[in-house]
C-alpha cells in the first residue's frame, strides 16, 4: 500500500497545502476526506448534482497518486457503485483530465470538480460502461431510470442523528420528574423482584398480625361478657337463697 513515504517531501508539502484549502473552502458539492498518514490516497464524497439521475446520492471516490505525481496523473475511482458511461465496473473513471489532458500544474480542486461535472455531462463516446453509454445515446429515459435505481440502492446518504435533541429530551424528562417530587420526601422503590417479595411479605405479615389482634380482642370481649353474665347470675341466685332464709326464719 502506498503511503507518504512513497511521495517526495516537496509533493507532500504541496498536497498538505491543497488539502487544507479544500477543507477550509470545499468546492460545491464536494467534501474531501483527509488521511494525514497517507496522502497518496485522496478520498472525497461527491453529492449528486441536482437535475441529474444522481440527485440525492452521495458518492465516495478516490484519487490514487503514484510515486512520480504530479508528473503523472492520478487514477480516479468511484468506490460507490454507480451506473455511468465513463465509470467501469471496477469503479475506474475515464476522463481526459486524468489522461491525455493532464498537466502537472492542475491541482486536486480542479480534478475533483471535473469528476463532479462528469455526473452532469457524461461522455458516451469514450464509455467504459458500454451498456450505459449505448443506453444514454439511444434511450435517455431508460438510462436515467437505471442511474436513479443505482443511486437509490448504493448511494443513499446515511441518516444523521441529533444527539443534542435526545439529550435535551432526557434532561427535560428528568426535570419534570424532579418537579413532581415533594421536597424532603423519599420514596422507596423496590429495585428487584426480591425487594418486591419482601415488601409483599411484610404487608401480608402486618395484615395477619392485625387479624390476630382483632380476633384476640373479640375473644377477650366475649370472655369478659361471659364472666359478667355469670357473676350476675351468681348474685341473683344468692339473693334468692337469702330471701328463702328470711322466709324460714319467719316460720
Swiss-Prot record:
SUPFAM superfamilies: UBC-like
Record-level GO BP terms: protein ubiquitination; ubiquitin-dependent protein catabolic process
Ubl conjugation among keywords: yes
Reaction(s) catalysed (UniProt annotation): S-ubiquitinyl-[E1 ubiquitin-activating enzyme]-L-cysteine + [E2 ubiquitin-conjugating enzyme]-L-cysteine = [E1 ubiquitin-activating enzyme]-L-cysteine + S-ubiquitinyl-[E2 ubiquitin-conjugating enzyme]-L-cysteine
Entry EC no(s): 2.3.2.23
Biased composition annotated in UniProt, kind: Basic residues: 241-251
CDD domains per UniProt: UBCc_UBE2S
Coiled coil (residue ranges): 230-251
Modifications after synthesis and translation: Self-ubiquitinated.
GO-annotated molecular function: ATP binding; ubiquitin conjugating enzyme activity; ubiquitin-protein transferase activity
Induction: By the herbicide isoxaben.
The protein's annotated pathway: Protein modification; protein ubiquitination
Protein name in the entry: Ubiquitin-conjugating enzyme E2 22
Organism: Arabidopsis thaliana (Mouse-ear cress)
Gene name of the encoded protein: UBC22
